[in-house]
Amino acid sequence: MSSENKEQHDLSPRDLPEEAFGFPSELPLETQRRSGTDLRQSETGHGRRAFRRIHMELREKPDTDIKQFVIRELQKSCQCSAAKVRDGAFDFFPVLRWLPKYDLKKNILGDVMSGLIVGILLVPQSIAYSLLAGQEPIYGLYTSFFASIIYFLFGTSRHISVGIFGILCLMIGEVVDRELHKACPDTDATSSSIAVFSSGCVVVNHTLDGLCDKSCYAIKIGSTVTFMAGVYQVAMGFFQVGFVSVYLSDALLSGFVTGASFTILTSQAKYLLGLSLPRSHGVGSVITTWIHIFRNIRNTNICDLITSLLCLLVLVPSKELNEHFKDKLKAPIPVELIVVVAATLASHFGKLNGNYNSSIAGHIPTGFMPPKAPDWSLIPNVAVDAIAISIIGFAITVSLSEMFAKKHGYTVKANQEMYAIGFCNIIPSFFHCITTSAALAKTLVKESTGCQTQLSAIVTALVLLLVLLVIAPLFYSLQKCVLGVITIVNLRGALLKFRDLPKMWRLSRMDTVIWFVTMLSSALLSTEIGLLVGVCFSMFCVILRTQKPKNSLLGLEEESETFESISTYKNLRSKSGIKVFRFIAPLYYINKECFKSALYKKALNPVLVKAAWKKAAKRKLKEEMVTFRGDPDEVSMQLSHDPLEVHTIVIDCSAIQFLDTAGIHTLKEVRRDYEAVGIQVLLAQCNPSVRDSLARGEYCKKEEETLLFYSLSEAVAFAEDSQNQKGVCVVNGLSLSGD
């Protein structure tokens, strides 16, 4: 560091030029300078300080008549023109804006490369995650295929990859298992031996035409949940209630994903060991599942266990190498696909299913099944479950969209993103698909391999189409334990969040506690309950932060006329007889007592002063045996003429965002207590909302509006000016003589 830079770095606030400090009011710069000059102390002929009040004229409020507002909005909405229709179409289908302007030479190579890589990664992941959702492998491929095409049409992000997502598959799987258990409570037969009806199920020797087996009923449940989640997401976009996502903080989402990852890991452990276990339901399913696993550990399939260990030994180091050399590799090595191909060949030629009873994926049909509407009769059963799924889906999608848009210097429309992800669920639900959302891991791969636009999603869809039409049956011999390993290895990112905890603790202890509470409740209770607990606990933490907020007395840095905390900064001077108090939170029913006690403790407690005056008066009466007429309180005041060190309390309201009824009553009470002992209370830097609340709450009369000031300097100057008027302190027009 050069000596010049070091010298600037070591400057104290007093040494900095005056322009470096902002005037504490919300006035334009010229007004601030003029006001600062007017408010500086100057001596008149009588030795008194000149004081000039700042006046601001309120703008006229717009007409708030609800009827007229509705009529205006309806008229605006019903106006139709060619330009408005075109803009509406372009807004609803963003692809119409950017596709005609597509730069083929600049973008095509990166889009094709990223689309191919993501498509190759999606094939094994789609098959693996479909098992997590309790579905056949083909439905996972359908889901990723349709989601890629639909987001291409409706999405505004250039980089995110939308498709099948592990956390949502877990939540879908829990609903599917619950509904299957309701329909078939007394049987654990395979899908080929169960015919499921709305009223229950029966065991049959073979699949009959017109009957819905376990697999068929499972996708009915999954597609119905997906349809409802999409409806919720589109409705939230239509009513512009995306603000719901603000209650899902980064710490909460991270903790939820990590906790759900433990549930996913637990659900896949049985595949790694080759155990045939029913999925546990309800609260504490993770613990119950591990109890079942350890009780049946002696039944472990050695072939599946060895295959799982070999796959782990290949996938984990390969993932680490991909991460370590991602800057040097033009594209990540598709290790998952290599493992799937190798494992399929080994299983097929080694006849692992026949010789060692290893569980395999089984028949995967080619082509597309005829579209079919969701089962409307299931909507009452799954409507509540779809709420949590829809919120998680759109929150992750919108946050990833905004993150990558900010990184690459463009904008996304959060409302349109909700439409996009909603239609990615509604439309595919008629084509035997499950819920989708954006996924961080695939989005990072997509970005790092040169993606420029969502044309890469079409390339990804073509790769999946090739698999659906030609390659899918070749995965017949693929062991389910391999798919379980792929699912678990892809949880690395979420499970490694534990490494970030020390840094998170240093940044915010409250966020760390939120992370832990959400993670533990999601893992040990259930994903839905964990999300609800996380949201409720986060809101409780917000309330807790405002219940005991920071507050301080302020001092003046004279050269800049800036007021700051005396406990934080050095070389600040307090004005004689004036206490400036700052409260950093909204003033409402939760923290009103905290505000009052902090002010009385740091400035002066008028209740104790008044009590001391009464006590002194009574003692003096006893000593001198003097008889007074009148009220005892008046007697106390008349006998106590010792001047107080404080004559004015200035409350800095700049950090008070709003007041409620309790807050207004508290300010009135504080003002009444201080005026009872001859101290005036002034409010400074109130925002328009607070001023409006004070006016509606009748904090002061029309002639008492002089108690509200636009800046601290103005309030302090007024206090000094009123005190200097021949030693008389003026309180709301009442003079209290000091002799």
From Swiss-Prot:
Effect of F368A: Reduced sulfate-chloride exchange activity
Transmembrane domains' residue ranges: 112-132, 137-157, 227-247, 255-275, 378-398, 420-440, 455-475, 524-544
Described purpose of this protein according to its UniProt entry: Sulfate transporter which mediates sulfate uptake into chondrocytes in order to maintain adequate sulfation of proteoglycans which is needed for cartilage development. Mediates electroneutral anion exchange of sulfate ions for oxalate ions, sulfate and oxalate ions for chloride and/or hydroxyl ions and chloride ions for bromide, iodide and nitrate ions.
Glycosylation site residues: N205, N357
Subcellular location: Cell membrane; Apical cell membrane
Catalysed transformations (reactions): oxalate(in) + sulfate(out) = oxalate(out) + sulfate(in); sulfate(out) + 2 chloride(in) = sulfate(in) + 2 chloride(out); oxalate(out) + 2 chloride(in) = oxalate(in) + 2 chloride(out); bromide(in) + chloride(out) = bromide(out) + chloride(in)
Domain named STAS: residues: 568-719
Species in which this protein is naturally found: Mus musculus
Region (Disordered): 1-47
Record's keyword terms, sorted: Cell membrane, Glycoprotein, Membrane, Phosphoprotein, Transmembrane, Transmembrane helix, Transport
Main location per the UniProt record: membrane
The keyword Transport belongs to this UniProt entry's keyword annotation: yes
UniProt record, GO biological process: chondrocyte differentiation; chondrocyte proliferation; sulfate transmembrane transport
Protein name, per record: Sulfate transporter
Molecular function, one GO term: solute:inorganic anion antiporter activity
